[in-house]
């Protein structure tokens, strides 16, 4: 096997991003600073693509998305969000893969997923269909745009997901809960509280949906529930505090738009979320999907089960799961396989020469990788991953310049390996020479 020469090239290629759209396009670039104003408060129908610059599918969609934007100009708004750069905005709408396209129609707080084709014609057809539905909704009395969310505090339907707390219910609901709570202390006469209310209500619904109820938004009338107001030193309105199990409450000091609130809530959720999945490479679909949908995929090649047994393998997997949890905010993919199970993958990554276990981090967009040179231990892997996150290290092209062929195989059953059983040989009919007459 030809040696793969590892050039001393900066690992910054892993983190390099370039937007796919420019100001000269008819595609409107959206960011956390303008999304609420441009999309949510707009009466227009919007098609929004959430993309990552390194995503191959996104790059292939780009010319078609631009074509659709030009065709729909002054009819339907077509936008794009660099969700790799603006994680909070992508997380706010549950974006887990790229590209994700959402249609913001009559109910801007509940966009629909676009499931159609990836051609300009298919996108335009879907947009016009959604536009017809928007007009029908308006004829039927449903209003589009932001005004539908601006209801007073007396309208319970607008704040159905905001949990009202009192002196009597607070401790049981909040302090005894395993969930994260964001609590607004308000006064009914407070103008700032009235301005915050529709944003808080809209955020509560989105956060509930995105976190499956693991982060809750609540409200306390501090003029009535004075025990709570005194306990937490409420001096002005509105005051928002964050409560987490076993920790002292902290003040929320972020922005007061729905987007800002949701962003902070999702950060809190990710801090308490489970680690990413650590998947065994048993098919080409698993390997390619994990690597293509993430900026990096971390691939571990563990020793053969006969060399470690189940206990030894599980100890390696525990280390990998621990580190996947530590680096979960990076949104990397995590894969593992057994030595010899995916020989073409090992060859392409130059794995095996250093023995097993081994690890490589792959950038599937650029078909380059970085190889773990240190020890396959928690400390050694952590140093390797930390260097990657800082954009440092040595890289090399993936052998063959393309994703290697993956062999389909059965997943590990969790048990120790077994040596193949050898057939017993019947020696009863074999004539053996007299040992005393052996000749040299």
Curated annotation (Swiss-Prot):
InterPro entries: PDI_thioredoxin-like_dom, Thioredoxin-like_sf, Thioredoxin_CS, Thioredoxin_domain
Reactions it catalyzes: Catalyzes the rearrangement of -S-S- bonds in proteins
Localization of this protein: Endoplasmic reticulum lumen; Cell membrane; Melanosome
Residues of the signal peptide: 1-19
Record bears the keyword Phosphoprotein: yes
Domain Thioredoxin: 20-132, 124-287
GO molecular function, one term: protein-disulfide reductase activity
Annotated disulfide bonds: 55-58, 190-193
GO cellular component: endoplasmic reticulum lumen; melanosome; plasma membrane
SUPFAM superfamilies recorded: Thioredoxin-like
The keyword Zinc appears for this protein: no
Keywords, in A-Z order: Cell membrane, Chaperone, Disulfide bond, Endoplasmic reticulum, Isomerase, Membrane, Phosphoprotein, Redox-active center, Repeat, Signal
Family: Belongs to the protein disulfide isomerase family.
Protein name: Protein disulfide-isomerase A6
């Amino acid at each position: 096997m030809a040696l793969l020469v590892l050039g001393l090239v900066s690992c910054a290629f892993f983190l390099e991003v370039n937007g796919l759209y420019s100001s000269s396009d008819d595609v409107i670039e959206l960011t956390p600073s303008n999304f609420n104003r441009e999309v949510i408060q707009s009466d227009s129908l919007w098609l929004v693509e959430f993309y990552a610059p390194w995503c191959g599918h996104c790059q292939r969609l780009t010319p078609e998305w631009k074509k659709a934007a030009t065709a729909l100009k002054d009819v339907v708004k077509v936008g794009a969000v660099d969700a790799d750069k603006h994680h909070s905005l992508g997380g706010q709408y549950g974006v887990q893969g790229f590209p994700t396209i959402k249609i913001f129609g009559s109910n801007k707080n509940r966009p629909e997923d676009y499931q159609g084709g990836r051609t300009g014609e298919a996108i335009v057809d879907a947009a016009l269909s959604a536009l017809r539905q928007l007009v029908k909704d308006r004829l039927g009395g449903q209003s589009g745009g932001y005004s539908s969310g601006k209801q007073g505090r007396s309208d319970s339907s607008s704040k159905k997901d905001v949990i009202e707390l009192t002196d009597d219910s607070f401790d049981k609901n909040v302090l005894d809960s395993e969930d994260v709570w964001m609590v607004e202390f308000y006064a009914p006469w407070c103008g700032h509280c009235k301005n915050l209310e529709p944003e808080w209500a809209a955020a509560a619904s989105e956060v509930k949906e995105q976190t499956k109820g693991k982060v809750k938004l609540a409200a306390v009338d501090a003029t009535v529930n004075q025990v709570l107001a005194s306990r937490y030193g409420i001096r002005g309105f509105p005051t928002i505090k964050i409560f987490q199990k076993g920790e002292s409450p902290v003040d929320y000091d972020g922005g007061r738009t729905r987007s800002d609130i949701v962003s902070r809530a999702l950060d809190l959720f990710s801090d308490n979320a489970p680690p990413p999945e650590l998947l065994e490479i048993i098919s080409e679909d698993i390997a390619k999907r994990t690597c293509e949908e993430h900026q990096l995929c971390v691939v571990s090649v563990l020793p053969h089960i006969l060399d470690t047994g189940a206990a030894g393998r599980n100890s390696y997997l525990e280390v990998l799961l621990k580190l996947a949890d530590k680096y979960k905010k990076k949104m990397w993919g995590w894969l593992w396989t057994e030595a010899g199970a995916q020989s073409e993958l090992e060859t392409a990554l130059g794995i095996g020469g250093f023995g097993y276990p081994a690890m490589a981090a792959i950038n599937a967009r650029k078909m380059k990788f970085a190889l773990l040179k240190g020890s396959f231990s928690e400390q050694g892997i952590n140093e390797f991953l930390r260097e990657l996150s800082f954009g440092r290290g040595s890289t090399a092209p993936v052998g063959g310049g393309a994703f290697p062929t993956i062999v389909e195989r059965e997943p590990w059953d969790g048990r120790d390996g077994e040596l193949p059983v050898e057939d017993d040989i019947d020696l009863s009919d074999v004539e053996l020479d007299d040992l005393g007459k052996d000749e040299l």
